[in-house]
Amino acid sequence: MNVYLYQPDGEQDNDVTFYMPHATNGVIVYLFKMGAEAAPDRTRLVSGYEAGRPIGLRLAVGACNDAFVLSCVRAPCVFRELFIHNRYTAPLGLAVVRAGRAAPEAWHVLSVHRRSEAKRTRHIRALRVHSNVGPDQCYPKALISLAGNVPASFLNTLQRCRAHHKDVAAMAMLCPDLRVDDSVVQFDGVQASIKLR
């Protein structure tokens, strides 16, 4: 996946929308348009207001040099239990991503770090969802690189986005087709007991 995102300049080109919880009953929404042009080679934070530094963000699966690395579990639904129980020493974030008119995808954010994945999340391999009806489902951890002219406010929101289980209802109001799953979940990794540190 290589997706190039730019600042929207019209009403009809908001191709990619990110929804992130901000506070009680508050959600921050970021709008981008997709394009075919390559983002700048150098990664830097921009405001989006400078004339010489327009927003030009490249999202790619996998860690890249000179990029911000987002460690997350991508799933077709939000797993509410991750945000109900405070089992982890570091709180988890949530970003709901909608590309065009497609169904929204939930990114359960573990960390955002410059140039490499944060040490506290390297041991996590997947999210296991327990089911009473059939076999457990596994969603692998994804590393997504953010390179080019990255909007500073967008990156700061991703880094500071901490979801609470009550935030899921506000997100579901903005995305009525967002699926919420209340199944029991756990992180799988190389250690027997996994805690985010």
Curated annotation (Swiss-Prot):
One Pfam family recorded for the sequence:
DUF884
Question: In which domain of life is the source organism classified?
Answer: Viruses
Protein name listed in UniProt? Uncharacterized 21.8 kDa protein
Q: What is the lineage of its organism?
A: Viruses, Viruses incertae sedis, Naldaviricetes, Lefavirales, Baculoviridae
